[in-house]
Structure formats: C-alpha cells, structure tokens
C-alpha cells in the first residue's frame, strides 16, 4: 500500500485501445425490453474477503457513515463497536498494528485510493475505550468448560467467542500477564498498555473465564489432566521460539539473540539499553520493531559485563531504570534478503524506521559471524544475493562485505516451543490443524494462532473464531464436511429485520397466492455472500467522485529525537474524519440508498420501501407489473447489488 495516489482521477468503462465487443448474450432484448427482471443480491465485499479475522467491515463503515441505523436506545458509536467486535474483540489494538490486507483488497483502489478501514477501526475501538462500552450479556452457561492453552490474541479471542456461545473456559498462560504478542512481542508505543488492558478486561468481564497465569502446560499441568478435567482443549500457545541465523557458531555465540527474546526483554521492562552497534537480520514486522526499539533504547558507555544486553535478553539479569538517564544513540542496521518492495514488513513501518535513523540494507544475506578471541561476535559477514525459483537465497560471489556489531539479532522467523508437548508436534515443530482447526487424531482437541502457522495477529483472531465454532459443533455432535467458500462474518438480513421488529410473519395459506405483498417471506432477495466476493467490474464506478483519504497523523521522531521517545506514534482520527472516511466506502455488494435505480427507471417500476418497513438491504423494491426488463437499474447501481435474472 502507498500513501500516494497514483491512479487516474476519473473512471472510464472503456480504455484507449479497447476493440473487443461485449457478449450480446449478457442482455437479452426485444426492443427496449427483456425477459429478465431485477433481483437484489447480497455479495461479500473484497475488503471482508481479504480480512483474515473476517470482520464485517462494510457493516461497521455503514454504521459510522450513518447509513445503517442502530436500535432506538443505542448510540451509533456503540452499535459500530458491536458490529466490529462480532469477529474481533480487539478493535483498538488491531486498528493500530494490523497491516490491513483489507485495504489492499478494497475496490476503491480502482477509483483513486483505498478506504482507510484500519483508521476507522481504531476510532471505533478507542471510542469504546473512552466511553467504557461493554460486550452484550452472554447467554446462560451450557455446562461445558474448555481449557484454552495460551492467553494471547488467539486464546483470548477463542475464550471470548466461546463465552458468547454459552461455554466457560479456563485460560492457561505461561507469562505473568495475558496479552501474548500484543504485550510481549510489540512495543508499547504501538500497543498502549492501558488500552490493551482495557480490551482484555472487557473480555474477562463476560464472566466464567478463569485465568491461570505463570502456568506451563506440559510441565505444571499435563495433557492427560486437561483431557480429564475439561470437555475440550484449545491450543493457542503461539510461536515464541525465534529461529537463529543459519551460519556457523550462531548458537554458542553469547551476543547473538532472537528478535522474539529481544522484544520480550524490552516489553517486560528488563532491557533499558542495548549495544553500541546493533544488526537485525529480517525484513518482516518483528525485525522493524527490533530496530525501532534499539534506536529508542540507545547504548551506554563502558557497560559492565553483567549488564550487557544479551545477558538481560537471556534472562540472567535486568537493567536498572537509572541507566536510561545516561544512554546515547546506537548505530542500528536492518538487513533483508529482499528488495525494499518485496519486504514483508508493512511499508509505513519501514518508512518510519528510516526516519528514526535506522540503516536498511536490502538484497543481502548473512554468510558468517566475525568473532573475537573471547568468542563474542564483533561483526557479521554479508553478501549480495538473489532468490532462486524455490525461494532460496543464493549469495553472489565477489559481493561479500562486513558490518561491525556488538549485538546481532535474528528475526527471520518463529516456531513453537512444544517442550513437554512433543506428542502434539509435527515435523515443523508446530501443531497440525484441519480446515475446522481440529487437531487430527485427537478427539476434542482444537488449535488456533501462530502455533498452526506463524502469520498475522488478525489471522490468529480469525482462526480462533473458527475453532470456537468447531468446538460448539463438537459439543452438539454436528459434523460439517466443509467451511463456507467465503468464510467471514456476513451481514444477515433476517437478523436486521428481527432487530427492527420486521421479521417475516407465519405463512398464511389462505392468502391470495401469487402476490408479492405477503409478509411471510423476504421477497426478491438472494444472499450469495457465503459464495461470492464482488469485484470492481460489477460496480458502476463512474458514480464515485474523487475524494482524498482522511489519514491519521503519525508522530514519527527523527533520528535526532528518537532516543528515549516511547510515546504513542499513531494518533486517532477525529469523529468528523472517521465519518467522512466511512462515507468513502462504496458499499460493494449491498445497497447504500443512492436512489439511482429509482431515479433512472423509465417505467417507475423501482420504488422505495415505505419507511416503516425499510432496513439496510430492503431500501428499494420492484413492481413487476411495470418492469419491462430494460436493465437500466442494474447498469446504474453503483454497488453491484442489482442483478438482471429474475424470471430466467
């Protein structure tokens, strides 16, 4: 993604050089008419299809913009919070740190620039925090209790979703506090601890979620004990074991450490300063966090042997906070195998690191350590490299060079620590999962998060929701052969009608048959959201004017200012900005009440539903006695909600 708008500012259906006629069979005409009539079809927007958590993004944007109205006794801000947290109980956290694959998928990229979904999500979460919003009262307990092993994003999300289904849980967490990667893997200036604590407390406030911290399952509690005392087990232990560099001598060199341990020592408050010259090998978000923290921590002159950074990171010591008063700037270098454009780290995070004084070397790979007589690393040997067709880096002969270092950090990947749980491990030291996040061959065992496959936080949250649903179905002895093709949280028209006391009435067989006025069914509506994602080609993009994105302000210190700067960097949108940004949403696959179909219908066949019967998704209807099948309504529908197909 880029902050710069590089696409043209106008939309053209046909481009210069187009010379192929459209298929005339798409529209079957007799004069100005056809035997096709409009029907209203709900599809999933690509933002939601691109969101690993499966959030109803279009839904909460519709609420923020004022299009979808809340119940009479609820503020729209709280209604948006409920919609956003149906899939993800951490809107404040994810609004800050999610790399937002939803924005890459946004159809508005084909107009001018994506909708700032991530920024609006942070606004929803921070508003909920400021106003003290709570989750809805959970249902009565079912009597089932699940052991959730791991209190990070996946484990907490699973406990949340399970409680909403009526199931109690006990969370076993090896650390002293809950939060996992939110707390121990990401610096506090990106995930403010007061907001994190509030979002965790909100989950626990649902009740019947027991927490046992400082407990290692496999050592303090055995798997057999969990099988005996609980109705199901969910493994959400994360991937807290960092991989070392594949160079000789790495494991027995004291000042060579993993990025996971570096960040854990910093976030735990033990690491107050780092080394004079720090190199981090990576290219992903963890490596960027390492170098950004290193620039903030700085160094101190003449550090004592027992206070060296690697001893603190290894857990053998802890720095006195007084060290912070005498620290100086450190030289920090980030190396990556790939070119800048191919780095997996979020582009803005890399930009910020450069602003803060980090040196970034792209297209290089480590080939060896340089050690002194004491066995400490004093530098890293590197070479330019190319990536072959199998994704393996190949060093280029004659391009070798050295970079001095007092601390070398590896952030090239993470794996699971399955000590005491070896019977669960696959050949990658992770836990196997099927499509339902069940552990194959272990009845009643489920898994979610990085221990399945290290990926994004939003992925862990989405997997936890699926696992919770699978646990619920396990208790009900329901067996499904497959998940939905588009496996996300969808708008549900029937739920919306129920919310506004407009649910279909019982069928009356004495009513005149053949009429569309009966209230026993939802007429002329098809829900394909679980099967289809709507592409931009199905929209009438010419409807949308160019509008600049409402961007958050990022407070990024320069290289001269970064030392000791641990204040939050990402500032929230104002309410006015959030509403304006939500209005840029094109509502792909769902009516957004623009009136185009009503205005342009030459037969006055399309009409607005009466206000006392109108809801989201039921704003317009069609009088088929008047409709001639001219398809104009479908052509001018900006959101692709109208299909010409009824009667075929």
Please give the residue ranges for each predicted region:
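Acidic/polar loop patches that form or flank catalytic/metal-binding clefts of enzymes
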Residues: 302-306, 333, 343, 361-363, ...
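Feature captures the FAD/FMN-dependent oxidoreductase FAD-binding
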Residues: 140-141, 145-149, 197-247, 368-381, ...
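Beta1/beta-strand and adjacent pyrophosphate-binding region of the FAD-binding site
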Residues: 141-154, 274-284
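Generic beta-strand/beta-sheet core signal
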Residues: 149, 172-174, 214, 235-237, ...
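FAD-site-proximal beta/loop scaffold in flavoenzymes
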Residues: 254-278, 284, 296, 306, ...
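Ferredoxin-type iron-sulfur electron-transfer modules and their immediate structural context
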Residues: 1-145, 193, 235-252, 260, ...
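Short acidic loop-to-helix transition motifs that present clustered carboxylates
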Residues: 216-220, 262-265, 340, 367
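Beta1-alpha1 glycine-rich phosphate/pyrophosphate-binding loop at the start
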Residues: 22-24, 48, 55-72, 110, ...
